[in-house]
């Protein structure tokens, strides 16, 4: 069965050429919220970037990495593949097959006890939780999650603020539970009262102002961006300024890494019947285009699900600044994280 699915993914792969602020608003009452001011960066001859086709692929859902060999892990059509910087793909972990669920997002472990390059994926069917997919393709359950609601976000803490654990969000109506999981599968609840969030979570680097080390999470319904602290407080960073609403609002997040050779990648999944039906491609923005748009290392990129309009958030001692930096195809349907590959 995997062979047929892998062949479908690889046959669908074809190389393609690569190319609001709010002030002092407070988050909904959770008993754990504060406020943060934002401002808008003045445009200084900056050129907005554009998401273009990096590679065609069947049913892409999420991208994560890079791994130590420079490849990006792609979740597509219920399986995993590895994307090389030139856009070529090869199957990975034939034993892994998503048991179902609309959005079983993934992340790749940094060096440490989780195992460098090991993939962790949300499992949305019983037993619900997180599965571990080793670098040699073996699959086992890491943790079973019992909090009520939809498991809808996953991100590694690479800063140490959360003890270098894996963070998972579970949404139940207007409230979100955040669980921290260690490499042995032990679970600690960070909060059960965070605001509603969903999608491509990211933990902020230390350079991200007062929010360094916090879990950054968007809410596609309202369009706002929250920071969730290791102590469980939810702080409003600001409004993204992107269109918001179900299947429209800000969905994907990723921090631009140091090094200056980053190419941003984002899954654009075909979703028939949606206002943004998608393209079944992985979209990309090259490093030169990011630089021309004023994006630099340490910035947070946030892309909307409908049309992949993209903001950059930059936080420092003086506060946070939010600015539109990229546009995408109007029909695009962004999903999962924004990952960064070695630029072509």
Segment roles from a protein language model:
Residues 38-344:
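Sequence/structural signature of beta-propeller domains
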Residues 20-46:
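N-terminal low-complexity, Pro/Thr-rich disordered segments
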Residues 1-7:
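Bacterial N-terminal signal peptides that target proteins for export
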Residues 16-17:
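C-terminal motif of bacterial Sec signal peptides marking the signal peptidase cleavage site
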Residues 10:
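…; additionally, a secondary subgroup of soluble metalloenzymes is captured
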């Amino acid at each position: 069965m995997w062979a047929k699915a892998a062949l479908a993914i690889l046959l669908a792969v074809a190389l393609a050429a690569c190319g609001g602020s709010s002030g002092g608003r407070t988050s909904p009452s959770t008993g754990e919220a504060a406020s943060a001011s934002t401002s808008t960066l003045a445009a200084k001859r900056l050129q907005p970037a554009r998401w273009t086709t990096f590679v065609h692929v069947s049913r892409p859902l999420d991208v994560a990495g890079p791994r130590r060999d420079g490849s990006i892990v792609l979740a597509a059509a219920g399986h995993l593949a590895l994307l090389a910087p030139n856009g070529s793909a090869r199957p990975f972990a034939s034993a892994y097959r998503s048991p179902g669920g609309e959005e079983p997002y993934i992340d790749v472990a940094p060096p440490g006890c989780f195992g460098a390059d090991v993939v962790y994926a949300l499992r949305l069917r019983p037993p619900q939780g997180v599965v571990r997919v080793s670098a040699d393709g073996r699959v086992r359950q890491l943790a079973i999650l019992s909090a009520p609601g939809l498991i809808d976000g996953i991100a590694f803490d690479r800063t140490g603020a959360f003890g270098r654990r894996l963070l998972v969000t579970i949404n139940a109506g207007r409230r979100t539970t955040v669980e921290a999981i260690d490499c042995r599968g032990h679970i600690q609840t960070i909060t059960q009262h965070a605001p509603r969030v969903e999608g491509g979570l990211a933990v902020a680097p230390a350079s991200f102002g007062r929010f360094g080390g916090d879990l950054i999470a968007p809410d596609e319904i309202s369009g706002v961006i929250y920071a969730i602290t290791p102590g469980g407080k939810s702080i409003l960073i600001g409004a993204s300024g992107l269109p918001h609403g179900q299947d429209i609002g800000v969905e994907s997040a990723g921090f631009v890494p140091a090094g200056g050779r980053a190419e941003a990648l984002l899954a654009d999944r075909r979703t028939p019947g949606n206002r943004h039906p998608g393209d079944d491609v992985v979209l990309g923005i090259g490093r030169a285009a990011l630089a021309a748009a004023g994006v630099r290392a340490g910035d947070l990129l946030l892309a909307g699900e409908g049309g992949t309009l993209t903001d950059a958030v930059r936080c420092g001692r003086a506060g946070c600044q939010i600015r539109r930096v990229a546009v995408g195809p109007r029909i695009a349907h962004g999903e999962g994280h924004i990952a960064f590959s070695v630029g072509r």
